[in-house]
Amino acid sequence: MSSSEVNKVFTEEQEALVVKAWAVMKKNSAELGLQFFLKIFEIAPSAKNLFSYLKDSPVPLEQNPKLKPHATTVFVMTCESAVQLRKAGKATVKESDLKRIGAIHFKTGVVNEHFEVTRFALLETIKEAVPEMWSPEMKNAWGVAYDQLVAAIKFEMKPSST
């Protein structure tokens, strides 16, 4: 990802599209979060190995007691960050959380391809959640917001200082 991609301006129109979609999705964020992660694992089954509680679990993914809460947290954080992007001018995740997220992603071996799969899965999840609103403009808005969040996470991807 080039620095010009990361520093793309998030326009008022993009913000409006993201806010409108999130208003609809928010009430169903737990289910959508789970769908989002199931899509990731469908596209890249090996991504399960990045999660200690999934690696050797005999429990089906959709029944794993730890997956849904984690998926919900990630989905909500991603969407809330997108909604706040224009106002804040950057991804809005607490710095301490970003450092922790970056360190975990570094430690577990997350690479660029994982972020690409996650981007695709996120956009597909949103497209399916709000099909009547979906458009190339909305896809682009969510893509720009996701790219900003990923850039912030990648910046913090280094060994934990704790």
Curated annotation (Swiss-Prot):
A motif (Homodimerization) lies at residues 42-46, 112-124. Keywords: Acetylation, Cytoplasm, Heme, Iron, Metal-binding, Nitrogen fixation, Nucleus, Oxidoreductase, Oxygen transport, Transport. Its EC number is 1.7.2.-. SUPFAM superfamilies: Globin-like. It catalyses: Fe(III)-heme b-[protein] + nitric oxide + H2O = Fe(II)-heme b-[protein] + nitrite + 2 H(+). Transmembrane segments: none annotated. It is found in: Cytoplasm; Nucleus. The keyword Nucleus applies. Its cofactor is heme b. It comes from the Eukaryota. InterPro entries: Globin, Globin-like_sf, Globin/Proto, Leghaemoglobin-like, Leghaemoglobin_Fe_BS. The modification N-acetylserine is found at residue 2. It holds the Pfam family Globin. Heme b binds at residues 52, 66, 70, 100, 105. One of its GO terms (cellular component) is nucleus. PROSITE patterns: GLOBIN (PS01033), PLANT_GLOBIN (PS00208). It is an enzyme of class 1 (oxidoreductase). Signal peptide: none annotated. The keyword Acetylation applies. Homodimer with distinct heme coordination in each subunits. PANTHER family: LEGHEMOGLOBIN-RELATED, NON-SYMBIOTIC HEMOGLOBIN 1. Belongs to the plant globin family. Phytoglobin that reduces nitrite to nitric oxide (NO) under anoxic conditions (e.g. during flooding or in waterlogged soil) and upon root nodulation. Required for general plant development and during nodulation, especially for the onset of symbiosis. Monitors nitric oxide (NO) levels during early phase of the nitrogen-fixing symbiosis and buffers oxygen in functioning nodules. May not function as an oxygen storage or transport protein. Has an unusually high affinity for O(2) through a hexacoordinate heme iron because of a very low dissociation constant. This is Anaerobic nitrite reductase. It comes from Parasponia andersonii.
